[in-house]
Every structure is written in structure tokens, then in C-alpha cells.
Amino acid sequence: MYKIIEVKQSVFEDNNKDANKLREECKDKGVFLLNIMSSPGAGKTTTLSRTLERLKDRMRIGIMEADIDSDVDAKTISEYGVRTIQLHTGGMCHLDADMTRQGLHEMGMEDLDLAVLENVGNLVCPAEFDTGSTKNVAILSVPEGDDKPLKYPLMFQVCDVVLINKMDVLPYFDFDVEKCKENILYRNPNAKIFEVCAKTGEGIDDWCNWLENEVKAWKE
């Protein structure tokens, strides 16, 4: 006699329970946890940099940079004078709730209004694991194509916000902005969409205003 155990399902269930506990902990401590996801090179770090330029003097912010290896992004972000830690995943392509909790506690979450997790660059794995975040953000860049929401459904289903980035190169790519929005809303009718260019700053103010209002509402 033997018993079959669906390991993957069990892992997800355990993580989801842990994520809900972490979300409650963040709520109790007034910490808004933002999980930023995208493919490699979509502009997570540059978008985060532009966000910090606008918000770092208006709230207490801490950043967790998750990568398989290296500390390139952490060095870039730390130059903005905010609390920054580097999380090495040891080959894993995502963070889960327990890893996120470790990062938050190491960073000293009690003194923060906004904690940002820049997840590992990947459109698949990070979407599968709830980090305990208050809100999830996906960044989709113009060069990637307007069909990505159809090809990677879960990423866009779990996100509260989608930033369509690199709008400055729109004339050079076969990218239909309205079609992209249609594809995003097909996967997630409730998604908030911003057209931005982290390089030029286009649309970043609107994004930051939304985020600041969400943080304030979370802390009430």
C-alpha cells in the first residue's frame, strides 16, 4: 500500500497560509508591501528608481532586491538613501512568503510605511507564489510585445497594477497599446494600467500618486 501526495499543491497551500499571516502582520504594523514583477530587462529597477525620486521624502521606504546572484540592483537603489537589502535566492526563480518575511524582519519593517520587493525577473514562477504582498505590480515593456498577457496569463491575473513601460520606443516596435490593454483586461478586468517611461519619467507621477494614496489608505 502507498499514498500519493500532490506535493506541488501542498507547497502552494502552505505558502498561501503563510502569506495571509504575513499580510495580517503587515497590516497590524502599518506596512504596505508592494511586490514588483516582470521579465528580465523590463525596467523594474529603473522604474523603482524614478518612484523613489518622488516618494522617498514623503514616506519611510525600504527595498528588498531579489536576484539569483549579484548585488547590482541593490547598489543602484541604495544610492537613493533608502534602506536596502539584497536577497539571494540560491538558484530559485521566485520568492515565497517565508523568504519575504525574512527580508522584512532583517530590514526592520516596524519603521517603514512602504516596503518594496523587486522580485526575480521571470514571468512565470513569481506569479505562482503569494509573497504576502498588499499589492502586486507587473511591468510589461513595449519591446516584449502586446501579446504577453495572453501568453503568461497568471502573471496578469494576480496583478493589481500593470505598468506598460518604455513608451519612448513605441515608434520602433509593432506594439499596439490599446490591444495590450485589451489583453490585460481580458485576463484581469480589475487591473489598473499606467503607460510609463522610466527613462524619461513619462507617466511616473500618475503611478506614484496612485501608490501614495494606496499606502495612506492601507495605514488607516
Where are these regions (language model features)?
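Nucleotide-state-sensitive switch-loop elements of NTP-binding domains
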Residues: 2-24, 28-37, 42, 46, ...
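Short, glycine/polar-rich helix-capping loops at beta-to-alpha or helix-loop-helix junctions
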Residues: 70-74, 148-152, 176-182
